């Protein structure tokens, strides 16, 4: 599952604001803000949309052998 830390790191790598991510994922700005602040986890559809748009932009989510989130990697530059 995407974590708030991974979302912030991915946005930083892509040089996207929270507004950029919200618009690209077609979710509300408050959804992104609240998620990244750790206030709540978005509903599955919204979390999937955020993850999908980050992966489409070339971000890979990294997990350790136990499945614990470990960070991100950029697989390509954003087009």
Language-model-detected regions and their locations in the chain:
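Short basic helix-loop element that most often maps to the first helix and adjoining turn
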Residues: 5-20, 76-77
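Short, conserved glycine- and acidic-residue-centered signature motifs
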Residues: 14, 43-46
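Conserved hydrophobic/aromatic packing and binding residues within compact polymer-binding modules
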Residues: 7, 21-22, 32-35
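DNA major-groove recognition helix of helix-turn-helix/homeodomain DNA-binding modules
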Residues: 26, 45-62
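Short polybasic/polar patches that bind polyanions
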Residues: 12, 23, 55
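Recognition helix of helix-turn-helix/homeodomain-like DNA-binding domains
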Residues: 26-42
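Helix-turn-helix/homeodomain-like alpha-helical modules used for DNA recognition
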Residues: 59-79
